[in-house]
Amino acid sequence: MGKPWSDRFEVGLHPFIESFNASIKFDFLLLQEDLDGSIAHARMLGKTGIINADEASQLEKGLNQIRLEASQGVFNADQPAEDVHFAVENRLIELLGPLGKKLHTGRSRNDQIATDIRLWLRRKIDEINFDLENIQKILLGHAEKNLYTLIPGYTHLQRAQPVSLAHHLLAYLEMFQRDRDRLVEVKSRVNTSPLGAAALAGTSLPIDRLYTADQLNFTSIYSNSLDAVSDRDFAVEFIAASSLIMVHLSRLSEEIIFWSSEEFSFVKLTDRCATGSSIMPQKKNPDVPELVRGKSGRVFGHLQALLVMLKGLPLAYNKDFQEDKEALFDTVVTVRNSLQAMSILLEEGLEFSLDRLGSAVESDFSNATDVADYLVSKEVPFREAYQIVGRLVKLCMKEGILLKDLSFDQWQDMHPAFDQDIYKRLTPEHVVASRISQGGTGFAQVSAQLENWQNQFSSLKE
């Protein structure tokens, strides 16, 4: 079937340019959304009397027939059409004859594709939110089992203070919750209908934009037709939000990679989620977190590509917009695959080495801050206490011992405020339990955090 504009041109399009210009191989992914938007548009044309009710009904039946053919694999991306819109229109004309040519009345591909993308992305945001909730629940399950499991806490990748493993894991629940909140905010801006803006200036026909918006469950319509067809802010926002999801997944991946190394040995990778080496038989490689860490760069790249693509575009529609779809599509696939792979890894692929974690928090100076706090409780100014503890640590390092190994005379020589109870204050359990500030790693505080998360997920079920 010839192109709609062929009567305007004297010669056909160069074959390579035709292929270069086509987008059907990737925008066919929007078929269901294109059919949904077209059905809403056909109903509106019938409601407003632009076409009669019988014609509107026949158009809807034809569009549903195409949907059926697609589900059977008969109607697919192997169409001699530039894009999904023309593929649908061509097939509709084959099914209905001249009536099929009426579907595009009062509509342009410009507002059509803008509508399709929003419908598709709205659904994908919900799917990603589900994936995020799932990984949160898996992390929460680990946290519930490890309230009293202690792990070294780090700053600058140097041991700093011991923390509850549950507290550490709950930090990622917080990150993923912010990701979910951002997606909800993005969805609120995705959920605005551009349908009816036509090419850029609206239409002279008496269309009803509010009706089509309601049919497609949009919450509002664009108030400026130029903005409606040229706005891709929502796509940038979505990929930016997705980039932060990948940042958080990458940070978690980095920790799992460290933890599974011989140098840390905080976790063991199970055979279900690890691979081996082709030459080194002893190896068990953390491929899943490494891949997730690597894939974050893809999403960051899509964000940069979209920003650069948009920055110099005049109003309204430009063919450059064709480049937004592959960035969006691949972002969704990458984020969902990464979330699902990490969820499987967390649920089935790693085991915490409790003995190793226990020995790790007993073998360093991460209790030094508590010695300073002890002196502060004895009315020693903090900065003076800090300096005293610094000298104690230096003494221990010189003698090759830990703070707990100092004799009581050595404590007293450093400051008379030290009493026998200093030894109890040095135990990792006491160090962690003493963190009573809201949001801290103290067992009571983490227990409250666990309860808050449990209540949050329970309320979602109701």
From Swiss-Prot:
Q: What is its main location?
A: cytoplasm
The protein's matches in CDD domains, at most eight in alphabetical order, are given as: Argininosuccinate_lyase
Question: Which GO molecular function, any one, fits this protein according to its record?
Answer: argininosuccinate lyase activity
Question: Which Gene Ontology cellular component terms are annotated?
Answer: cytosol
Per the record, the pathway is: Amino-acid biosynthesis; L-arginine biosynthesis; L-arginine from L-ornithine and carbamoyl phosphate: step 3/3
Entry EC no(s): 4.3.2.1
Tell where it localizes: Cytoplasm
**SUPFAM superfamilies, per the entry:** L-aspartase-like (SSF48557)
GO biological process, alphabetically ordered: arginine biosynthetic process via ornithine; L-arginine biosynthetic process
> What keywords would UniProt list here?
Amino-acid biosynthesis, Arginine biosynthesis, Cytoplasm, Lyase
Q: Which reaction does it catalyse?
A: 2-(N(omega)-L-arginino)succinate = fumarate + L-arginine
| Pfam families hit by this protein | ASL_C2, Lyase_1
Task: Report the sequence similarity comment from the record.
Answer: Belongs to the lyase 1 family. Argininosuccinate lyase subfamily.
Q: What is this protein called?
A: Argininosuccinate lyase
